[in-house]
């Protein structure tokens, strides 16, 4: 697969493709980062961006992972000691998912976010950002709160400064990070920093058909064992012949087919015998025309995700 195809695989948006093309033409090893707030278990929604970092690493990018312990503290996710322990757990998960330990730079927010240089740039960006703009950049939970904390408005400002001081070319995140990334593109040049390119991945559906979230308990954790996976998929929303907003198909599209050249769905002879698919497009077709039953799709998802997550479970045991 060509580098540009790897970079664009399973991406919802690139801001901008023209800038990306120029970057690849002028820099042999561009840099990219994703920040993760250490606030709970890593689930397959998080792994979407890890997959993209893996693609970028294969395409020659230098990768930085920000373990944003200060962000988590400001977002009321625990004491600094608690969020640091969660950050260490995150790091183990990301390495077990395939990030190259020799080619990935893991940075804790507390390593640089408390420095005078960092805080001065945060203050400069707050001066250049309106209150309404800061509110729009808050996460969904913060925007819906009747009386959010000031720290929750500073959070997106800090995220923009993270990009600047880490010195990366590309910011990677879910499409829900778009407003923060646009704030960085608009505000950082005024502080003397370059505007980052942005790569946005989709938001993964939870097993009930809504957004995958630890708070909704509709997620697959990277440390779920085989029994837990089978139990969760048995209850998963997966209407027959429906390829729109189907969470089980999404898991194949974003997590399984990029890792397997072919998928075998094991079935008794009386139900047609084993069915082999060699691409996501082929899988979607046989599910849409009724050749593949939802339960067979679910069983296949449980089997392949169990294999994908085995290295993570081994590290965490």
UniProtKB/Swiss-Prot annotation:
PROSITE patterns: AA_TRNA_LIGASE_I
Motif ('KMSKS' region): 211-215
SUPFAM superfamilies registered for this protein in UniProt: Nucleotidylyl transferase
Positions occupied by motif 'HIGH' region: 38-46
Annotated catalysed reactions: tRNA(Tyr) + L-tyrosine + ATP = L-tyrosyl-tRNA(Tyr) + AMP + diphosphate + H(+)
Family under the similarity heading: Belongs to the class-I aminoacyl-tRNA synthetase family. TyrS type 3 subfamily.
Name the UniProt record assigns to this protein: Tyrosine--tRNA ligase
Organismal lineage: Archaea, Methanobacteriati, Methanobacteriota, Stenosarchaea group, Methanomicrobia
């Amino acid at each position: 697969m060509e580098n540009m195809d790897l970079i664009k695989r399973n991406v919802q948006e690139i801001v901008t493709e023209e800038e990306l093309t120029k970057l690849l033409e002028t820099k042999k090893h561009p840099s990219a980062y994703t920040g993760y707030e250490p606030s709970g278990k890593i689930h397959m929604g998080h792994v979407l961006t890890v997959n993209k970092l893996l693609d970028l690493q294969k395409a020659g990018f230098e990768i930085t992972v920000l373990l944003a312990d200060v962000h988590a503290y400001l977002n009321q996710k625990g004491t600094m000691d608690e969020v640091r322990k969660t950050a260490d757990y995150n790091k183990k998960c990301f390495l077990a998912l395939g990030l190259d330990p020799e080619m990935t730079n893991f940075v804790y927010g507390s390593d640089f976010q408390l420095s005078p240089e960092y805080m001065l740039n945060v203050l400069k960006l707050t001066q250049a950002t309106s209150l309404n703009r800061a509110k729009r950049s808050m996460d969904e939970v913060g925007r819906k709160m009747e009386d959010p904390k000031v720290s929750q408005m500073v959070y997106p400002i800090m995220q923009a400064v993270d990009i600047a001081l880490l010195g990366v070319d590309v910011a990677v995140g879910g499409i829900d990070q778009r407003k923060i990334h646009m704030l960085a593109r608009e505000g950082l040049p005024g502080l003397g920093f370059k505007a980052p390119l942005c790569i946005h991945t989709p938001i993964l559906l939870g097993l009930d058909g809504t957004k995958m979230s630890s708070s909704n308990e509709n997620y697959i954790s990277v440390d779920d064992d085989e029994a837990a996976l089978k139990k969760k998929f048995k209850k998963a929303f997966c209407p027959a012949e429906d390829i729109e907003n189907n969470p089980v198909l999404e898991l194949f599209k974003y997590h399984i087919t990029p890792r397997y050249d072919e998928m075998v769905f094991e079935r008794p002879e009386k139900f047609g015998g084993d069915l082999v698919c060699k691409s996501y497009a082929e899988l979607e077709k046989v599910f849409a025309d009724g050749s593949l039953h939802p339960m067979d799709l679910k069983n296949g998802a449980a089997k392949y995700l169990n294999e994908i997550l085995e290295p993570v479970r081994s590290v965490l045991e």
